[in-house]
């Protein structure tokens, strides 16, 4: 009887600790909402829905969340507001905010948490350098920077160079500073100089890739798993990655892409197999594969 009462008190204490933790997280994370009431309700619903499916892998969770967000309208520039604080918008996404959102949702369940405040915290963790929003340049704009920073902190792992047939590309990442007028935030001299400082770390940056030609073969297709984060390398000078999405394997065994498509105007499970998608997009040079968690 005494042991039973002790367990009840212990469980209550754990629940209280988690509640206080979530409350503290909310207080510590300045957040800009598109629709706070609707978004927090939907985040809670998404987390509860996927948590109820049991012991899924991280990749399965990412895939499930990605499918649940299909038909979300494509909206560019949702983060381009001042001051730079964490922005949450489930009503409209571009390719980057879509991937960040599903990754943060899956990350929250991987931590055995299910509160919307925990999702908000995790979204900030993966979007910003060292998890802290501190001006425009603290956002991880270049996907290579996003991968390096999140890998260093054990949140993501790039597995591209562990897959058979991988190659590499060497590029100097300076697209943003060379196209300053395309980024309104860079009209501010301090932000511009900070972005240039970030780019200094990516001069002659070497990164792994699976060549587009390889990924158009059955051998290449077989390398992709359900829920992989796929980043598409580009021919564009000064830029590493031009698009990003989530892999899903169709019943015929072929990988497709769930992504926020500007062409379709919404998040879609692309009807084209990945190989055909690559064949049609001549500016894509290859694919990088990233997975959630520290997989070293």
Report each predicted region and the residues it spans.
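Acidic/His-rich structured neighborhood in mature extracellular/periplasmic domains
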Residues: 69-204, 253, 259-262
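C-terminal soluble interaction/assembly domains
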Residues: 230-294
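Short, well-ordered loop/turn sites that connect or cap secondary structure elements
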Residues: 223-224
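Boundary at the C-terminal end of the N-terminal hydrophobic targeting segment
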Residues: 25-27
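Cationic-aromatic interfacial patches
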Residues: 29-100
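Bacterial N-terminal signal peptides that target proteins for export
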Residues: 2-13
